[in-house]
């Protein structure tokens, strides 16, 4: 959410004419869509209010999450460079940049539109600008974060149009959140936020229904979530009576004895701490195979999934993403590409995924 999405965001300010190299092999599929104008959003006031019927949430965990992210200050780029987890923030931003470059369309004959669910403070706006998109809508449950995202967008002089809304994509239909002319996108992004939907089956189905409605055939849903396989591995390593694991950077704590299985796959709550980012906030396990199976029922087919550290090992020396690490200053304590120490263990808690919309 306000991590939305990015639990941790960090990157350099944009510079003119700086674009990441764009791989072409990823985008051989045909995306069905209606003709769109370049000024898709220009008839709106960017207030984030048009067409949005405010959804009041009564869930206690949801209120805690919203309050947590609303309370986090937007420190600005320079102050963020002094974060005690700056290497982790840079690494996570590199992961998201890789994900965007691999799966966001790179077409030039029609506008590319993005829906960022759980956009937070707008930490991915620069990434989308570099991807050459034409339109962007960000939605987040934390109203303060949405206002900070609007401010960041205004100050960055982006090459794309954007609107921001305060709303809950996990509890409200997209028809309640967005007006009719703002409900079709080429990419839906869910960065460091989808685990909150797994509080209940209903929320997961509302989310996936919204994603499916927003995407044409060939559109993609991309995201980053905690890796349920890693959670299982740590649970198996716990001694009787132990309920948590982690290090000085991050901690995972179950309120009761950790479950030995993830059935049913919803409502498996734990508390997450990440230094300088998340303070003991309730989150939910996302059993990945259950997620994949439910997504298929909404015509969303898994096309790619990898743990963060596997992405690092596979891409750090590639022609495209290796130099990107250098530019984003993603280096360990010895100056090598990557991440080390306790921050590496924290990064290993996550995976990235991509689904493609099939059918209609």
UniProtKB/Swiss-Prot annotation:
Binding-site residues, mRNA: 92-93
Residue span of region Disordered: 1-62
The gene coding this protein: pcm1
Residues annotated for S-adenosyl-L-methionine binding in this entry: 96, 118, 140, 168, 191, 196
The protein, known as: mRNA cap guanine-N(7) methyltransferase
Function per UniProt: Responsible for methylating the 5'-cap structure of mRNAs.
Gene Ontology CC: nucleus; P-TEFb-cap methyltransferase complex
Domain mRNA cap 0 methyltransferase: 83-358
Keyword tRNA processing: no
Subcellular location: Nucleus
GO molecular function, one term: mRNA 5'-cap (guanine-N7-)-methyltransferase activity
Subunit structure and binding partners: Interacts with cdk9.
Family named by the database record: Belongs to the class I-like SAM-binding methyltransferase superfamily. mRNA cap 0 methyltransferase family.
Enzyme Commission identifier(s): 2.1.1.56
Record keyword RNA-binding present: yes
Basic and acidic residues bias (residue ranges): 7-19
One example of a Gene Ontology biological process annotation: 7-methylguanosine mRNA capping
Coiled-coil segments on the chain, per record: none
Stored PANTHER family: MRNA CAP GUANINE-N7 METHYLTRANSFERASE, MRNA GUANINE-7- METHYLTRANSFERASE
One Pfam family this sequence matches: mRNA_G-N7_MeTrfase
Lineage summary: Eukaryota, Fungi, Dikarya, Ascomycota, Taphrinomycotina
Main location per the UniProt record: nucleus
Alphabetical keyword list: Methyltransferase, mRNA capping, mRNA processing, Nucleus, RNA-binding, S-adenosyl-L-methionine, Transferase
Site-annotated residues for mRNA cap binding: 121, 127, 152, 195, 283, 350
Reaction equations catalysed: a 5'-end (5'-triphosphoguanosine)-ribonucleoside in mRNA + S-adenosyl-L-methionine = a 5'-end (N(7)-methyl 5'-triphosphoguanosine)-ribonucleoside in mRNA + S-adenosyl-L-homocysteine
């Amino acid at each position: 959410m306000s991590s939305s999405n990015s639990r941790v965001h960090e990157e350099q300010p944009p510079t003119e004419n700086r674009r990441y190299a764009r791989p072409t092999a990823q985008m051989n599929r045909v995306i069905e869509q209606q003709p769109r104008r370049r000024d898709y959003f220009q008839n709106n006031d960017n207030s984030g209010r048009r067409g949005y019927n405010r959804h009041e949430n009564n869930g206690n965990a949801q209120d805690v999450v919203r309050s947590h992210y609303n309370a986090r200050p937007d420190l600005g780029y320079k102050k963020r460079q002094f974060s005690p987890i700056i290497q982790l923030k840079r690494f996570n931003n590199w992961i998201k940049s890789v994900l965007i470059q691999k799966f966001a369309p790179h077409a030039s004959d029609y506008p590319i539109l993005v829906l960022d669910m759980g956009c937070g403070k707008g930490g991915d706006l620069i990434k989308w600008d570099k991807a050459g998109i034409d339109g962007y809508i960000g939605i987040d449950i934390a109203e303060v974060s949405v206002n900070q995202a609007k401010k960041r967008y205004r100050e960055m002089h982006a090459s794309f149009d954007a609107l921001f809304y305060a709303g809950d994509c996990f509890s409200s239909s997209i028809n309640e959140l967005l007006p009719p002319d703002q409900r079709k996108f080429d990419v839906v992004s869910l960065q460091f936020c989808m685990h909150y939907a797994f509080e209940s089956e209903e929320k997961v189905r509302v989310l996936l229904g919204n994603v499916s409605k927003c995407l044409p055939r060939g559109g993609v849903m991309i995201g980053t979530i905690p890796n349920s396989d890693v959670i299982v591995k740590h649970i198996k390593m716990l001694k009787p009576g132990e309920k948590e694991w982690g290090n000085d950077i991050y901690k995972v704590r179950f309120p009761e004895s950790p479950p030995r299985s993830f059935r049913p796959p919803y409502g498996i709550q734990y508390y997450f701490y990440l230094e300088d980012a998340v303070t003991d906030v309730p989150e939910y396990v996302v059993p990945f195979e259950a997620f994949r199976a439910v997504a298929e029922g909404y015509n969303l087919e898994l096309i790619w999934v990898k743990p963060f550290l596997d992405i690092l090992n596979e891409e750090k020396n590639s022609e495209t993403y290796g130099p990107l690490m250098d530019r984003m200053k993603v280096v360990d304590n010895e100056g090598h590409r990557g991440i080390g120490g306790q921050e590496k263990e924290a990064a290993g808690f996550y995976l990235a995924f991509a689904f493609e919309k099939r059918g209609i």
